[in-house]
A protein has these predicted regions:
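Detector for conserved single-position "signature" residues within domains
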Residues: 1-291
């Protein structure tokens, strides 16, 4: 009988493989702070309290949490609060799922000015969806949507994209609801073109307003090269089929977007290379996580 591999949390992975990684990699101050918080979370390092049962007298030690937003152990309550808030917002109508992705040519700039670029992304997507919903050709009303930022893909490489969960309809000025056509919300090619235009405009304005401090592409020549690269690629907006009603939407939110990061350490089934077949070592996955 083969037993399932035990679940090992991120803190344990850092304890086991962190020293070897840190011996050859220097962490920026921000990442080092997160690293220390995850290791200290719910341990004696942060202190705690002793709880005693009034009936049997049994005692236990409860250690404090680090409350760092990157810590998997501390996200359960935040997840539950977020989900409860979204439950109050969901409408009893079909939903659509759209994905707005930034071209990888922007990855270097995103790494240098993440907050500014993420704000531009949210702004461009919000303005695009609002504009299309207000157009009488499509809905002619006020849009509602939930935007969720993802900054990496499954292999932990940088892949910045925004998921949009959009009700199939809009609210007119007189309070009436305008439903979208069955299985159709907005034309994808037009969405992509408008989204790119709004983002690139915001990018140029940010450079003019000196909001990209620290970026290495602000000089005229590298800036023109960046804009040419950005315009070379099609900005595809991916639209998935309708997600159905509120129950399906909430299921999607929970299982797709609120998964807590846990790394499973595989059993010692190694190939001739010393690695589990087809898998990276935990140390390699750790390197991608902190990169």
């Amino acid at each position: 009988m083969v037993r399932a591999a035990p679940r090992v949390g991120l803190a344990e992975v850092l304890r086991r493989h962190g020293p070897a990684y840190l011996a050859t990699h220097a962490l920026p101050a921000v990442k080092a702070k997160v690293w220390r918080a995850i290791l200290a979370c719910r341990t004696a390092a942060l202190g705690g309290q002793e709880q005693t049962c009034e009936t049997c007298g049994a005692t236990r030690h409860v250690y404090r949490s680090c409350r760092n937003r990157h810590c998997p152990k501390c996200q359960t309550r935040a997840k539950e609060a977020w989900l409860a808030a979204r439950q109050r917002e969901v409408l009893p109508v079909p939903y659509f799922h759209l994905v707005f992705t930034l071209p990888h040519d922007l990855n270097g700039l995103i790494g240098q000015c993440p907050r500014a670029l993420y704000e531009m992304l949210f702004g461009a997507v919000s303005a695009t969806l609002t504009e299309f919903a207000a157009n009488p050709r499509w809905l002619g009303g006020t849009a509602a949507f939930t935007l969720i930022l993802h900054t990496w893909k499954q292999d932990l490489g940088r892949h910045v994209h925004l998921h949009a969960l959009v009700p199939g309809g809009a609210l007119k000025a007189d309070g009436t609801w305008v439903p979208a056509k069955p299985g159709f919300l907005f034309p994808n090619e037009a969405l992509s073109s408008v989204f790119r235009g709004k983002f690139v405009t915001a990018l140029k304005l940010a450079r003019q307003a000196c909001k990209l401090q620290g970026a290495t592409v602000l000089a005229d020549h590298p800036w023109r090269e960046l804009l040419r690269a950005v315009h070379r690629h099609a900005w595809v907006v991916y639209a998935k089929h309708s997600l159905g009603g509120p129950e399906q939407v909430l299921d999607y939110l929970v299982y797709r977007f609120l998964k807590v990061l846990t790394i499973r350490l595989m059993p010692d089934r190694t190939s001739s290379t010393g690695k589990p077949p087809g898998r990276d070592s935990s140390r390699e996955r750790l390197a991608r996580y902190v990169a």
